[in-house]
Amino acid sequence: MELAKTKTGEMIDLNFARKVVEENKRVKDNRGRQEIVLFNGLTTSKLRNLLELINHVYTKVYNSDDTTLSEDVRDELEYLKVKFAYESGREPAVRTFIEKTYVDKLVDVVLKKNTKKIFLDYCKYFEALVAYAKFYRMGD
């Protein structure tokens, strides 16, 4: 599964998801106890809210027999970009997450390729980001 490439030519796939989360983790000392911080303070609830937006569209696409994305789904993906922009403006940690993981730019890739498969791959990538975020917060 390869969704796209970064400006440096690195493939954006499930391995990239692990790598980008790992590279954006830091340990913060909070009154004598160490706390793992991802993407400059991205909270689990904020990350899950973003995933919920994608899962709403995922359900429609997954249950469809079409191999291409319907106009309704394409409209929802366009709106998803708006939501990403809004959340980025409200929360610097969300902006960092979106910029480092390319989740907003990948929506454009999904819209351009317009296939069910590429959208489902995008969902897997986003789920991997959430899974690795959970893993690295609990680990170490």
Curated annotation (Swiss-Prot):
Alphabetical list of Pfam families matching this protein: Csm2_III-A
Question: Which GO BP terms apply?
Answer: defense response to virus
- Tell me yes or no: is RNA-binding among this UniProt entry's keywords: yes
Key word tRNA processing present:
no
Entry superkingdom:
Bacteria
Q: How does it assemble?
A: Part of the Csm effector complex that includes Cas10, Csm2, Csm3, Csm4 and Csm5.
Q: Describe the task this protein carries out.
A: CRISPR (clustered regularly interspaced short palindromic repeat) is an adaptive immune system that provides protection against mobile genetic elements (viruses, transposable elements and conjugative plasmids). CRISPR clusters contain spacers, sequences complementary to antecedent mobile elements, and target invading nucleic acids. CRISPR clusters are transcribed and processed into CRISPR RNA (crRNA).
Q: What else is known?
A: Encoded in a type III-A CRISPR locus.
What is the protein's name according to its record?
A: CRISPR system Cms protein Csm2
Protein species of origin: Enterococcus italicus (strain DSM 15952 / CCUG 50447 / LMG 22039 / TP 1.5)
